[in-house]
C-alpha cells in the first residue's frame, strides 16, 4: 500500500450469519483504518443444459443481487466507503481474485453450505491457505 492508497478490505457475503458478521467486522476495521470495503457476493451452480441454465442464471443472479443489496443497506449508514461486486464464479475463486489488490480479506467461518459441526467451511479454509493477503475469519458473536 503506497502513501496515496487507502486500506482495502475485501469481504465475502452470502447472506449467512457468519458472512454478515464478517461484513460488520470489515466496516468497523475500515473505519479504524480510514479504509474502504469491497463486498463480494458470488454465485455458482453446476452446469446444466442451456435452456435451464439461462433460467437458473437469472434466478441465481437476482437472489445474489437481493442479498447483497440487503447486506449493503444494513451498513450503509456507517459512513464507510463500501462497494459491492456480484461475481458468477465459485465463492473461493471469486474472493481470491477480488482480493489480489487487497490489504485484508475477511470471511465468515461458515456459509450456507457449512456443516454445523465444522469450525471452518470450505471457502474460509481455502482462502486462509491460498490468499495473497492476510485473512481474517469471523465467527458470529466473537467480537472483542
Predicted regions and their residues:
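Structural beta-alpha unit
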Residues: 1-5, 18, 73-105, 142-144
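Small/aliphatic-rich secondary-structure junction motif
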Residues: 2-53, 98
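Anion (oxyanion) recognition and catalysis
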Residues: 31, 76, 129
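General small-molecule cofactor/ligand-binding pocket signal
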Residues: 38-40, 83-87, 136
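A short acidic, glycine-rich active-site loop
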Residues: 55-67
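A conserved short alpha-helical segment within the catalytic HATPase_c
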Residues: 68-72
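Glycine-rich, Arg-bearing micro-motifs that act as flexible, cationic patches
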Residues: 107-130, 140, 144
Amino acid at each position: 500500500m503506497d502513501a496515496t492508497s487507502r486500506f482495502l478490505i475485501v469481504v465475502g457475503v452470502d447472506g449467512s450469519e457468519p458472512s454478515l458478521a464478517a461484513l460488520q467486522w470489515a466496516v468497523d476495521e475500515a473505519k479504524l483504518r480510514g479504509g474502504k470495503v469491497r463486498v463480494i457476493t458470488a454465485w455458482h451452480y453446476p452446469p446444466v443444459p442451456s435452456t435451464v441454465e439461462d433460467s437458473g442464471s437469472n434466478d441465481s443472479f437476482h437472489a445474489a443481487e437481493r442479498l447483497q443489496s440487503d447486506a449493503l443497506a444494513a451498513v450503509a449508514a456507517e459512513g464507510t466507503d463500501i462497494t459491492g461486486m456480484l461475481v458468477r464464479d465459485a465463492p473461493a475463486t471469486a474472493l481470491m481474485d477480488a482480493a489480489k489488490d487487497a490489504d485484508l480479506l475477511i470471511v465468515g467461518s461458515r456459509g450456507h453450505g457449512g456443516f454445523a459441526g465444522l469450525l471452518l467451511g470450505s471457502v474460509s479454509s481455502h482462502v486462509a491457505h491460498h490468499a495473497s493477503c492476510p485473512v481474517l475469519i469471523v465467527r458470529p458473536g466473537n467480537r472483542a
